[in-house]
């Protein structure tokens, strides 16, 4: 009886994974067909530039003005992005998932090609780590709303460009957000080391 139940469970799990994969590729195919590629290219590029540029600009300004609280904020935001990208790239090369345009060249049109594996989305992880850490640091609606919309736009852009599955983007968002919250505790220790 145990073997029958185990066999049924294995078949059900396999069927659920096939269904999830179908949802993933069907969503990419649909979103990839939307003609928003210029906007997506802009969002996608900003997802690589802003997560580095914002904390760097904050840090440089803080050093020039000798503003230690701002420098602490820059360190928190910058280390959050670094942590998110570290986790993301460790997973990317451990899992080594093919990009949608490589696995389904007849169904997905790549707007831009990438050299790294697909899962999870590094651009999305970086965008959500920046958006979440900014929102935690400056909890005002005029910081939270635009940064959240921008991060979601980066995730959408990666699917629209055909370079990621929705599961890549969702996992990247979870990693980026999670690193921002985890880094609150890590930076308490780091602030003692750097600033006291």
Give the positions of each predicted feature:
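Interfacial segments of alpha-helical transmembrane regions
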Residues: 63-86
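Short helix-capping/hinge motifs at transmembrane helix termini and TM-loop junctions
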Residues: 64-66, 95-96, 139, 162
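N-terminal transmembrane-helix/juxtamembrane module of multi-pass inner/ER membrane proteins
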Residues: 16-58, 72, 89-116
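Membrane-water interface at transmembrane helix exits
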Residues: 15, 61, 88-96, 135, ...
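Juxtamembrane loop-transmembrane helix junctions in multi-pass integral membrane proteins
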Residues: 35-42, 69, 135-138, 142
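Bacterial Sec-dependent N-terminal signal peptides
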Residues: 1-23
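Membrane-embedded catalytic cores of phosphoryl/pyrophosphoryl-handling enzymes
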Residues: 105-196
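Small-polar-interrupted transmembrane alpha-helices in polytopic inner-membrane proteins
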Residues: 79-93, 144-157
């Amino acid at each position: 009886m145990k073997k029958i139940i185990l066999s049924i469970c294995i078949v059900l799990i396999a069927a659920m994974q096939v269904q999830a994969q179908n949802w993933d590729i069907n969503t990419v195919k649909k979103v990839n067909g939307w003609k928003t590629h210029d906007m997506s290219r802009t969002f996608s590029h900003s997802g690589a530039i802003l997560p580095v540029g914002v904390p760097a600009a904050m840090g440089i300004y803080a050093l020039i003005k000798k503003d230690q609280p701002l420098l602490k904020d820059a360190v928190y935001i910058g280390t959050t992005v670094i942590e998110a990208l570290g986790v993301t790239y460790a997973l990317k090369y451990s899992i080594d998932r093919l990009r949608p345009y490589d696995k389904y060249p007849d169904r997905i049109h790549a707007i831009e090609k990438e050299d790294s594996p697909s899962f999870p989305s590094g651009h999305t992880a970086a965008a959500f780590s920046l958006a979440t850490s900014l929102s935690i640091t400056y909890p005002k609606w005029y910081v939270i709303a635009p940064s959240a919309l921008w991060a979601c736009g980066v995730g959408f852009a990666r699917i629209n460009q055909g370079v990621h599955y929705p599961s890549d983007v969702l996992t990247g968002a979870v990693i980026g957000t999670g690193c921002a919250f985890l880094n609150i505790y890590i930076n308490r220790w780091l602030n003692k080391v750097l600033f006291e």
